[in-house]
């Protein structure tokens, strides 16, 4: 998917990108490739692959969820900024917080946000377990996203505490998502969530499976969650 195809594909979904926004994506791609030479940000560096598997894939959530209804977003373990920064480029009104445990990725994201002229974007170098117990952030976000490889039961413990009551947790998964959901149902309920919607689709060009789950926060997360750093991964609630 080249940049022109990317722009057309989004337009077909009702997301019209201006020349300025297209330049932001171009600069994002250039910086990603440049910085990737000195630090491991992504295994995907081919332009067409980046536009499809990073940019388009990140924005695909907006085909099913109305981002104009949200004000604040937190992206847990965003790595090189996915999915939150491509979403931010498309929906500039969003106030985005990104938390990641690797300092070098924070350095990249800071430089990237400055280059792209992104405002209302904040980066926090922290473990998700610690961040979720921080009163300044706990249950403060309209929407929390995760595009991480961790199991859904683990992601729920890391992300649900950050979602405000009535807000949503958006889980983006590839294949085997249904199986993961079954093992995560206990955790989702415990942390105050309810699975509201599931969208399954294929990524264009390569036709690979994608799944998006919208989990609504119906009640507050018990204070003891998330547990200490490392515990959710070692002893997931399933």
Curated annotation (Swiss-Prot):
In which compartments does the protein localize? Cytoplasm
Residues that span the membrane, as ranges: none
Q: What class of enzyme is it?
A: transferase
* Molecular function, one GO term: rRNA (guanine-N7-)-methyltransferase activity
Pfam families given for it?
Answer: GidB (PF02527)
EC no. given is 2.1.1.-
**In its keyword annotation, does this UniProt entry include Iron?**
no
Q: Name one GO cellular component term.
A: cytosol
> Which residues does S-adenosyl-L-methionine bind?
77, 82, 128-129, 147
SUPFAM superfamilies, alphabetically? S-adenosyl-L-methionine-dependent methyltransferases
Keywords, in A-Z order: Cytoplasm, Methyltransferase, rRNA processing, S-adenosyl-L-methionine, Transferase
Looking up InterPro entries in the UniProt record yields:
rRNA_ssu_MeTfrase_G, SAM-dependent_MTases_sf
Protein role? Specifically methylates the N7 position of guanine in position 535 of 16S rRNA.
User: What is the similarity comment for this entry?
Assistant: Belongs to the methyltransferase superfamily. RNA methyltransferase RsmG family.
Instruction: Name it.
Output: Ribosomal RNA small subunit methyltransferase G
